[in-house]
């Protein structure tokens, strides 16, 4: 069997994207890095986004850190998800930065969260720390669109969390708010502050926040599609 090659330009169809992702299934991260001419870091402590970058190179992703989807022409977002030996997610999944100001008139339908999650290519990757990074294998891809129930679950959490932001309660939001979607600080250091609305409607400075999918949401999603027991 011939070795796969990274896509040199963005895929033109979902079928091409999925076919390329399926070719990567079963390869280790070290093998894919070597085939792409990259060096595999010893661990992810200083290279937290390395796996995502590696797979973006292989799949011809275009967006980088821009607000549009990774495959903007297809409207598809790429999400790598570290899983244990039973295929269960090991951590929450970052969706996008949470807007803390300028939220008047924003609805779920027009929200950045929904835009990012309306079509997702999930790629599970072995994530147990006992497995050296280079030896972790890539799993089978899943091209997913939220069904009605999933959309409702996410919408209810998003509305609850956005209400708290708009009402000046951002500092009261904890990771326990939201059943499937949570907001928590997203900053490499505590000095990176951003503007938000305070309890009396005044401008305050606070840590940037991000939206994350909780493990119970992604676990059910993967289990349903891969029939994990």
Swiss-Prot record:
Pfam families: MutH (PF02976). The keyword Calcium does not apply. GO terms for biological process: DNA modification; mismatch repair. SUPFAM superfamilies: Restriction endonuclease-like. The keyword DNA repair applies. CDD domains: MutH-like. Disulfide bonds: none annotated. It is found in: Cytoplasm. GO terms for molecular function: DNA binding; endonuclease activity. It comes from the Bacteria. Keywords: Cytoplasm, DNA damage, DNA repair, Endonuclease, Hydrolase, Nuclease. InterPro entries: DNA_mismatch_repair_MutH (IPR004230), DNA_rep_MutH/RE_typeII_Sau3AI (IPR011337), DNA_rep_MutH/T2_RE_sf (IPR037057), Restrct_endonuc-II-like (IPR011335). GO terms for cellular component: cytoplasm. Sequence-specific endonuclease that cleaves unmethylated GATC sequences. It is involved in DNA mismatch repair. NCBIfam families: mutH_TIGR, PRK05070.1. Belongs to the MutH family. This is DNA mismatch repair protein MutH.
């Amino acid at each position: 069997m011939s070795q796969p090659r990274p896509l040199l330009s963005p895929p033109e169809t979902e079928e091409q994207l999925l076919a390329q992702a399926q070719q990567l299934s079963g390869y280790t991260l070290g093998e894919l890095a070597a085939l792409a001419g990259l060096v595999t870091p010893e661990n992810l402590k200083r290279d937290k986004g390395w796996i995502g970058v590696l797979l973006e190179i292989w799949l011809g992703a275009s967006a980088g850190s821009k607000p549009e989807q990774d495959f903007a022409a297809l409207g598809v977002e790429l999400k790598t998800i570290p899983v244990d030996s039973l295929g269960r997610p090991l951590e929450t999944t970052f969706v996008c930065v949470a807007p803390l100001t300028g939220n008047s008139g924003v609805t779920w339908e027009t929200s950045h969260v929904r835009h990012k999650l309306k079509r997702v290519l999930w790629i599970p990757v072995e994530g147990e720390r006992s497995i050296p990074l280079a030896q972790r294998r890539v799993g089978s891809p899943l091209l997913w669109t939220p069904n009605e129930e999933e959309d409702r679950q996410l919408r209810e959490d998003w509305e609850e969390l956005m209400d708290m932001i708009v009402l000046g309660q951002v500092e009261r939001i904890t990771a326990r708010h939201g059943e499937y979607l949570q907001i928590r600080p997203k900053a490499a250091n505590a000095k990176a502050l951003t503007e938000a609305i305070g309890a009396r409607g005044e401008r305050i400075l606070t840590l940037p926040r991000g939206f994350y999918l909780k493990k119970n949401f992604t676990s059910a999603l993967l289990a349903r599609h891969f029939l994990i027991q």
